[in-house]
Amino acid sequence: MARRIYRFIWNRRLSSWQLQQGLYAIGQATVARYGADELVVAIDPVNFEKPYPHDLEGVSTVHKSCPPDRKGKARLARGYPALTACVVNLPEPVVTYAQWFSYTREFLSENVELMQAITTTRQLYPEHPLCFVADSG
């Protein structure tokens, strides 16, 4: 599905909001098709490294453990933090939230992003009991 979305990124007639709404509609149709009683939603903060970030807007310093440095330790790299929420108890995953962000002046906190992921997921699936899970990392 990502390949289909990439061709729309530079299309000025299609906004990121419209892409997200389409992604959410696909997710809602998938959940309805499987008829799950409860949804288990994994919330995953990740860091994306950009190899040549010199001209990119809002690039941040992120903590990367994969691949490690020469000593096998985590390292600092240039890139973007992101947060995803995904239904994981169906035969196919369903994205309920996906957001890249940057540590700029406008950025409030990662906790605000976490709350937005939970709020968005609750708005998309108000009739389903939700169980949110995350790792301790």
Regions found by a protein language model. Give the residues of each.
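Active-site-proximal, Lys/Arg-enriched surface segment
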Residues: I9-P93
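Short flexible/disordered coil segments
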Residues: F8-W10, S15-L19, W100-E110
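Compositionally biased, intrinsically disordered low-complexity regions enriched in proline and serine
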Residues: R7-I9, G35, P81, A98, ...
